[in-house]
């Protein structure tokens, strides 16, 4: 850096090359921000598309692989989280952040044209000549041309992204303390004496919104460096103050949920990668207090049949699934699940829903359990709150009943309309165990039909009719089609 001159201007003095190079360094970074934004949006868009495909894969696995219900559901939720992450990344650019990228591009354009103008006003010849508008800070002599390379003025619309930090670039520019006017030379026509060269010119001429100023008497205004002008400069100040946040969002890399056997292997082949599934698995299990496994990695390895560095049993099971999907009009083709494109997966989901509907229509529903009077009373009588009572598909609250123990009553008509199969109850009104589970030990009590709760093996089958189950599954699948 060079010491500041006295607060006096000299008509025709050039811009100091040090200051010019600082402006160019900033401009080179600023003009790449649109490319950086395009890269970020492309990453997020691709992640969202792939994660939607992963959702469809997991939904099909949920229907086709009952032994891997928890694994498929965990990946379905994980894919949903990834879609949400991608959407959040895209939404970063719906307001001020995009405006700031535009400001960076705008400021770069203004700097480039000024620098090309100043550098172009020079005497042709070797270094040492002083007839120039962009000269050495010490002495003002002509310097080698640098604007095209330092400002990168020749780049077109297809400029490459570089992950550069616009906030840091604006800060660096704002720290330049070199006086803008070179200490020698007096031949620049652009910085001539405005007051004498024109019949009248009462005011100074600000450039770049006041980052630089041509004094009314000529030359660049001394004592006003980029450092002193930048804090209030509309071209730069917002990028200096908020550019770091923009840079952080531009650097965001949105990952996608797995859609291939290799991607599943990567996600499940190490403890660090498997840990990414914890939030999704916790959401699926909705653990009761004290029920969550202390060793998540051991749990998730068991769920997927995973081992370090190997394909998981779940991934291999997916490899064994092939489904007929439409191709040309009137024809179908059997495709392996991993090879399916989104259109194929959508057709496979529709076909799977149709299969479930057909199966539900051809199988007679399980006979309803006829409740005794004592059992029906036990289902509802312990509920005291009216809202809770009425929320049950088989209870209704009778506000006129004087006996508080009988206000919540069993409603057989409501139960029939709801389609809910009623649980058997024990002598104390608690849910009874079924014959197939009640005599099993803790080790024998296994899913999918039985579940150990407390000190008893209980029937874990879903207490809903086939029609109700179908509506839930169909709704879940249909939501993935759009």
UniProtKB/Swiss-Prot annotation:
GO biological process, one term: symbiont-mediated evasion of host immune response
Cysteines paired by S-S bonds: 24-151, 133-188
GPI-anchor amidated aspartate lipid sites: 459
Signal peptide coordinates: 1-8
Highest taxon listed in the record's lineage: Eukaryota
Glycosylation positions in this chain: 92, 398, 411
Topology in the lipid bilayer: Lipid-anchor; GPI-anchor
Propiece span(s): 460-482
Keywords: Cell membrane, Disulfide bond, Glycoprotein, GPI-anchor, Lipoprotein, Membrane, Signal, Trypanosomiasis
A Pfam family per the record: Trypan_glycop_C
Annotated InterPro entries: Trypano_VSG_A_N_dom, Variant_surf_glycoprt_trypan_C
Name listed for the protein in its UniProt record: Variant surface glycoprotein ANTAT 1.1C
Organism expressing this protein natively: Trypanosoma brucei brucei
Organism classification: Eukaryota, Discoba, Euglenozoa, Kinetoplastea, Metakinetoplastina
